[in-house]
UniProtKB/Swiss-Prot annotation:
HAMAP family: RibB
Homology family: Belongs to the DHBP synthase family.
Protein name: 3,4-dihydroxy-2-butanone 4-phosphate synthase
Catalytic activity: D-ribulose 5-phosphate = (2S)-2-hydroxy-3-oxobutyl phosphate + formate + H(+)
Site (Essential for catalytic activity): 136, 174
Origin species: Yersinia enterocolitica serotype O:8 / biotype 1B (strain NCTC 13174 / 8081)
Residue numbers binding Mg(2+) 2: 38, 153
Pathway: Cofactor biosynthesis; riboflavin biosynthesis; 2-hydroxy-3-oxobutyl phosphate from D-ribulose 5-phosphate: step 1/1
Binding site for Mg(2+) 1: 38
EC number(s) on file: 4.1.99.12
PANTHER family: 3,4-DIHYDROXY-2-BUTANONE 4-PHOSPHATE SYNTHASE, GTP CYCLOHYDROLASE II-RELATED
């Protein structure tokens, strides 16, 4: 990742700490992966703290595929089968079947409805019957170990939410340009500045976690 582009957002450690602080205060963050991987930026929110306004922003400026990043424990609690038995996607993105809240929604498409679905899925006492399948929210199963196991947006979202003191669940959506193309680092940074969102890279987060674990050992 071009560090010059990211210089306005601080050092790698500062970028992670600012992202954690933003989530802790109910704001969103932009998460970039490596230029040799997807080379995309995702809007990321802590699932527990996301607002309808933030969901509307996500739908308006994103790909439309709003994903709920959850642990495998939560996936099993909700009895969500994986979308396919044999995952042949390039980066092994671990989609489950899509979901909709069983109660409190209309068509399930609106910002409010999608947030209702997310809240139903992350509730402490959530059970499989709280969700209908299919729906308009796309759960993603994170790998145990987070970004230290897989350097994906899914794991970064869960790690950041956890570091901010929330349940291990994040909401993400890929940022797109006005013409429908995918936003890369320059456009992601421009969007982040416009919407007062920190920018952090997955590599930043992995290095931060490795450093924290070394200190703890």
């Amino acid at each position: 990742m071009n560090q010059t582009l990211l210089s306005d957002f601080g050092t790698p450690v500062e970028r992670v700490e600012r992202a954690i602080d933003a989530l802790r205060n109910g704001r969103g963050v932009m998460v970039l992966d490596d230029e040799s991987r997807e080379n995309e930026g995702d809007m990321v929110f802590a699932a527990e703290a996301m607002t309808v306004e933030q969901m509307a922003l996500t739908i308006r400026h994103g790909s439309g595929i709003v994903c709920l990043c959850i642990t495998d424990e939560r996936r099993q609690q909700l009895d969500l089968p994986m979308m396919v038995a044999n995952n042949s996607s390039q980066f092994q993105t671990a989609f489950t079947v899509t979901i909709e809240a069983a109660k409190g929604v209309t068509t399930g498409v609106s910002a409010a409805d999608r947030l209702t679905t997310i809240r139903a899925a992350i509730a402490d006492n959530a059970k499989p019957t709280d969700l209908n399948r299919p729906g308009h929210v796309f759960p993603l199963r994170g790998q145990p170990g987070g970004v230290l196991s897989r350097r994906g947006h899914t794991e970064a979202s869960i790690d950041l939410a956890t570091l901010a003191g929330y349940k291990p669940a994040g909401v993400l959506c890929e940022l797109t340009n006005d013409d429908g193309s995918m936003a890369h680092a320059p456009e992601v940074i421009e969007f982040a500045k416009l919407h007062d969102m920190p920018v952090v890279t997955i590599d930043d987060l992995a290095e931060y976690r490795q450093s924290q674990e070394k200190k703890a050992s």
